[in-house]
A protein has these predicted regions:
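Glycan-recognition and catalytic cores of secretory/periplasmic carbohydrate-active enzymes
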Residues: 1-151
């Protein structure tokens, strides 16, 4: 079941951007935002599924998707203080960042508590599976933001 779920999730991977697209940009309320390839910080919670699918199946495709997504999120979703944007919209072909904003938070430049927690969990998980210290460092920076910004 985990591998089947990972196969399904992998259909949302956009190789040109190196990310897992969160929503269909042309449907429902998302269609009114002008997005092409919206990616939400919530997706960091999905990476464990991909790492586990690689462990269970031996297919490194899932691992590679998880690492690509984590790296692009690390590069583009965070402000200088390590708070995260809720949504980053990419050009799906080139990977260029088109917009950084919120869909459910207070404002585009506000920090969203759940999003910060998802980033913390996601990068801790990435470190656990890859042993790449950059993920542990990112998790620590996100933790420091959460700890030092209680309101």
């Amino acid at each position: 079941m985990i591998v089947e779920a990972a196969k399904s999730l992998s259909t949302r991977f956009r190789p040109g951007a190196g990310v897992i697209q969160s929503w269909d940009a042309d449907k429902g309320w998302q269609g009114t935002r002008g997005w092409k390839c919206p990616v939400i910080i919530d997706n960091m919670m999905n990476l464990e599924l991909l790492f586990e699918a690689t462990r269970l199946s031996g297919d490194s495709t899932y691992y590679n998707i998880a690492v690509s997504h984590a790296d692009r999120t690390l590069k583009n979703h965070f402000r200088a203080d390590y708070s995260s944007y809720h949504v980053v919209d990419y050009d799906p072909e080139t990977g260029e960042v088109r917009k950084r904003q919120t869909a459910q938070g207070y404002a585009d430049e506000s920090a969203w508590a759940r999003g910060q927690a998802w980033a913390l969990y996601g990068y801790t998980t990435c470190y656990r599976y890859t042993k790449d210290k950059k993920y542990l460092d990112q998790a620590q920076k996100v933790y420091n933001f959460i700890f030092n910004n209680k309101n």
